[in-house]
Regions:
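A structural "flexibility-hinge" signal
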Residues: 2-210
Length: 210
């Protein structure tokens, strides 16, 4: 997914939390939405860069009854990390009171992620896919890994099989050199390169795209 789509998703979710919230000064609405977008994007990217691909996959493939509901997301450490980061930004950058900032973050971030997970899992929504998201986070490394699998004689191998390796579905066996750790570290490398490209990940980076 490109950042623009994520930005629009955040914007859609930000009505009550940001736009109609008197605690967030109106002149900062767009910047706050951009900041939230950046928090989610860089949070996911940092997870992959730190070798946490498995955590992202389980976050996105958790389709049990309330697995991706915004309430159960509050129990997820990745989500809590994002909430803390975003809340800190609101307080430090926009002088929003700590309690209010925490309320905004705890409302907006799980909502956005919940929508993102639902859209990513919705086959009729072509704009969002876990494949597109990971490819964007890793600067194209995900597609590269899948392509290599196909080239090494595993011609039917696709992105679902890659995910299957982590969730226990899909083709477990396939040509050599495709150990899970190898894949995790390749994608981590791609995400690290993207992190560096984006420097501190400020608002301008966000507007320029991943």
């Amino acid at each position: 997914i490109m950042l623009e789509q994520l930005f629009n998703l955040v914007k859609e979710a930000s009505g009550d939390a940001v736009i109609n919230n008197p605690a967030v000064p109106n002149e900062h609405n767009n910047e706050v939405v951009a900041e939230a977008t950046n928090t989610v994007a860089s949070g996911l990217r940092n997870m992959v860069a730190g070798g946490g691909l498995q955590s992202i996959i389980s976050l996105f493939s958790n389709k049990n009854e309330q697995g991706s509901g915004s309430n159960s997301l509050l129990n997820n450490p990745i989500v809590n990390m994002m909430i803390g980061h975003f809340s800190g930004k609101l307080t430090n950058k926009y002088n929003i009171d700590g309690t209010q900032a925490n309320n905004v973050a705890s409302n907006l971030i799980p909502n956005v992620l919940s929508n993102l997970i639902n859209k990513t899992n919705d086959p009729s929504d072509n704009g969002f896919s876990l494949e597109g998201l990971l490819n964007s986070i890793t600067g194209g490394k995900t597609a590269e890994v899948v392509q290599e699998q196909q080239n090494s004689g595993n011609s039917g191998f696709n992105f679902q099989d890659l995910i299957g390796k982590f969730t226990g579905g899909g083709q477990q066996n396939g040509g050599g050199g495709n150990g899970l750790m190898d894949i995790v570290s390749r994608l981590a490398g791609g995400a690290q390169a993207q992190q560096q490209k984006n420097g501190g990940g400020g608002l301008m980076d966000l507007i320029k795209g991943f």
